[in-house]
């Protein structure tokens, strides 16, 4: 059993035994800043490049149908909607916030942000700094040893993107310590890389770590001149791991309009 698996097993056992004092193995510190509301945000109008607004009917959509849709959402007890924005032909035809959430503030994007990490990897490939067939262990060459060279010899960048790495170290394992890259590279495999699908957010985290390893910049810093600034995306926040690496697969807070801009790219 790998060190990470042993650490997780120990943590679970201590919780069962009610030995919870100093049980954590990960250094925690608050990260998320207060959301920058209002007109006072520096350069907001000039930098954020808001999408054009339009009356629904001018884009072939009935306002009455949209109003009925919003009412159904508000009355549906099993749906906890925070905000909704409808974009048609590149124009915003509806935006709504459901109490107590005001329209226009950021929200956790969960796994939607994996697509943004994928964009960054595509940019890195376009710049000639990475290839889909590159081996993960070669990117992190300073961490090579006899064990992980053998175990991870077939795991490629493409396997991380399409969730076929088969690496066992997943989100559960991050409670075992601060160095998540080490935990991933020391992990075993639960299948055949490139053949077996296993959804694992740590694959996307490792893509983010690759960007830092190759460029010396965090994923957030790397995307700033390539994506955030050109698209006017300013009010955004992405959590980092204890080592300062952007999480990549989760932890992104983004405004609905900015998420819509990214969706329009495809």
Residue ranges and their predicted role:
Residues 203-210, 250-266:
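Active-site-proximal alpha-helical segments within enzyme catalytic domains
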Residues 110, 197-199:
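Catalytic tyrosine of NAD(P)H-dependent dehydrogenase/reductases that use a Tyr as the general acid/base
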Residues 90, 108-133, 160, 207-211, ...:
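Active-site SXXK
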Residues 102, 187-193, 203-205, 241-248:
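Flexible glycine/proline-enriched surface loops and loop-helix/loop-strand junctions
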Residues 1-102, 126-130:
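N-terminal leader/targeting segments and the immediately adjacent pre-domain N-terminus
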Residues 13, 17, 67-70, 122, ...:
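Non-transmembrane alpha-helical segments in soluble domains
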Residues 127-165, 186, 215-250, 254:
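Active-site helix/loop module of the DD-peptidase/beta-lactamase fold
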């Amino acid at each position: 059993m790998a060190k990470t698996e042993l650490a997780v097993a120990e943590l679970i056992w201590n919780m069962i035994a009610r030995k919870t004092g100093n049980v954590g193995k990960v250094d925690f510190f608050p990260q998320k800043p207060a959301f920058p509301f209002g007109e006072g945000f520096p350069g907001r109008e000039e930098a954020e490049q808001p999408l054009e607004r339009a009356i629904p009917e001018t884009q072939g959509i009935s306002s009455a149908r949209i109003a009925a849709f919003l009412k159904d959402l508000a009355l549906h007890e099993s749906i906890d909607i925070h905000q909704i924005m409808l974009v048609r032909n590149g124009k915003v035809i509806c935006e709504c916030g459901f109490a107590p959430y005001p329209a226009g503030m950021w929200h956790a994007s969960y796994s939607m942000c994996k697509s943004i990490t994928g964009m960054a990897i595509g940019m890195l490939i376009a710049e000639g700094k990475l290839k889909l067939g590159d081996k993960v262990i070669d990117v992190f060459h300073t961490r090579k040893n006899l064990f992980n060279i053998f175990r991870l010899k077939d795991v490629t960048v493409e396997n991380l993107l399409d969730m076929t790495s088969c690496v066992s170290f997943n989100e559960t394992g991050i409670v075992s310590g601060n160095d998540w890259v080490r935990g991933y590279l020391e992990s075993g495999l639960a299948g055949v890389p490139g053949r077996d699908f296993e959804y694992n957010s740590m694959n996307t985290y490792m893509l983010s770590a690759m960007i830092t390893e190759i460029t010396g910049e965090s994923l957030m810093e790397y995307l700033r001149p390539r994506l955030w600034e050109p698209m006017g995306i300013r009010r955004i926040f992405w959590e980092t791991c204890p080592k300062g690496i952007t999480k990549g697969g989760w932890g992104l807070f983004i405004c609905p309009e900015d998420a819509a801009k990214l969706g329009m790219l495809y």
